[in-house]
Amino acid sequence: MRLSQYFLPLLKENPKEAEIVSHRFMLRAGMIRQQTSGIYSWLPLGKKVLDKVCKIIREEQERAGAIEILMPTIQSADLWRESGRYDDYGLEMLRIKDRQKRDLLYGPTNEEMVTDIFRSYVRSYKDLPLNLYHIQWKFRDEIRPRFGVMRAREFLMKDAYSFDLDYEGSKTSYNRMFVAYLRTFSRLGLKAIPMRADTGPIGGKLSHEFIILAETGESAIFCDKQFLELSVPNSSIDFSDKAVLDDTVKQWTSFYAATEEMHNEEEWARLSEENRLSARGIEVGHIFHFGTKYSAPMEAKVMGQDGKEHVVSMGSYGIGPSRLVAAAIEASHDEKGIIWPKSMAPFDFGIINMKPDDEKCTQACEFLYQGLKDAGFDPFLDDRNERPGSKFATMDLIGLPTQIIVGPNSIAHNEVEIKDRKTGAKKSLKVEDVLSQLSIL
C-alpha cells in the first residue's frame, strides 16, 4: 500500500481524552475514532491489525477442533429468562423492545443462544464432543467506559462453547482450550500467564484468566517467575491426546499465579524471594467450566450409550480481539509510538522514500515495493512529498517492525538503511540484497 493513496488520519498532538498509552497511540495513529461514549469505529490501519488478530485466533480454534458459527447480536429475552440470568445481569445489559413489544437484548454473551442451538439439533452422545465458536460484536453498558477500546461498551469477542457427555469429557475440552489459548497468545507475540479466576456472572466452579504483563496494566498480579521460562506447545501438539493436554495444563498451573482479587498471602509467602514476581497485568482471555449451569434449566440433553438421557456438561472460552489490540500496545511501545509484534503488525515492512523527487530514490523504492509484494509480503510505502522527519515520526508511531529507509546519500552507493523498530538498530544493505535478507527475518 502507498501512503499517498491510503486513509491514515494521523493526530500530531496527544488527545486530551486519552488516559492510557494504547488509547493515545490508537487515536494518534488513526486506528480508531470515537463515535460516542465507549463506541468506536475501526479505521483502515486498526482494522488490519484486528483482522490479523482474528486470523490467528481462528487458526488456533480450528486446530483445537472448534467449529465456527455466527450468532446474532440481538437476542430474545425469553432465552435469558429460561436460564435464570435475565434479572441477574443488571443495567450492564441493554434491553430493548421491538415494534411488537417483544423483549430483546443486545447480547453481552451467548451461553443461552448457543445452548438453544445445541438442544435443537444434537440428540446423541455420538455427536459429542462438540465445540462451537463465533467472533461477534458485544455490548455491555459500562457505567464509566474509559481507556479507549480497553474498556469500551461495544467490543469484539471470540466466544467458544464446548458440549460433552459428562464432567470428565468437559474437563478435557477445557484443557484443550487452555492449551489453544497458550498457543494463540504466543503466536501473537505475547507472554500470557494463566491465573485462577472468579467465575463471576458466567458461573461454574473452574475458571482461568490469561494475563499479559504490562507496566500500565489495570490489575496487580503475583506469580512465580518460573512462568517466564515455560515453553508453549508447538504446532505439532496432538489436541486429541488427553494425556498430553492434561500434562501441559498441569505444568502451566503448578506454579503460583493470582490477581489481587484471588491473591493468597500464605501461599505467596511460601515462594522464595527470588522467585516472586509482583507486577501489573492485563486480562486478555478468560475460560470457564460451568458444567450444567445452562444445560440443566434449558434441558440440553443427549441420549447416552446406556439408553438414558444425559444433561450435557459445558464450558465457555472468551478472547476479546479488540481489547487484545490495545493490550499489545500497552505491553510493547516507547515514547515514539507502537512497537508491534510481527504477527500483529498492519504491514510487514515500511519503506520510507526520503526524497520522492529524486529519480534514483524513487526507482529503488519501486523496486523494493514491488519485489516485496511479489514475494508475498505486504509493504507500506511512504511516498508522500513530506519532510523526512515527518516520515520517520509516522513510521515510528504506527510501529511497523522493520523500516527500509531510502535516501539520496545511501542510494548513491546503491545501499539502503534497514532499521529495527524495537531495538533501533540500523544496518546498510545493497539494494539487490534487501529482498533476500528481509525474507529470512
UniProtKB/Swiss-Prot annotation:
Its subcellular locations are:
Cytoplasm
Picking any one GO biological process from the record gives: prolyl-tRNA aminoacylation
The family database entries (InterPro entries) matched by this protein are listed as: aa-tRNA-synt_IIb (IPR002314), aa-tRNA-synth_II (IPR006195), aa-tRNA-synth_II/BPL/LPL (IPR045864), Anticodon-bd (IPR004154), Anticodon-bd_dom_sf (IPR036621), Pro-tRNA-ligase_IIa (IPR002316), Pro-tRNA-synth_IIa_bac-type (IPR004500), Pro-tRNA_synthetase (IPR050062)
Q: What is its main location?
A: cytoplasm
EC assignment: the record states 6.1.1.15
**Record's keyword terms, sorted:** Aminoacyl-tRNA synthetase, ATP-binding, Cytoplasm, Ligase, Nucleotide-binding, Protein biosynthesis
Q: A cellular component term (GO) from this record?
A: cytosol
A molecular function GO annotation: ATP binding
EC category: ligase
What Pfam families does the database record attribute to this sequence?
Answer: HGTP_anticodon (PF03129), tRNA-synt_2b (PF00587)
Question: Could you confirm whether the keyword Transcription appears in this record?
Answer: no
Per the similarity annotation, which family is this? Belongs to the class-II aminoacyl-tRNA synthetase family. ProS type 2 subfamily.
**What does this gene product do?**
Catalyzes the attachment of proline to tRNA(Pro) in a two-step reaction: proline is first activated by ATP to form Pro-AMP and then transferred to the acceptor end of tRNA(Pro).
Q: What is this protein called?
A: Proline--tRNA ligase
Species for this entry: Bartonella tribocorum (strain CIP 105476 / IBS 506)
Q: What gene name is listed for this protein?
A: proS
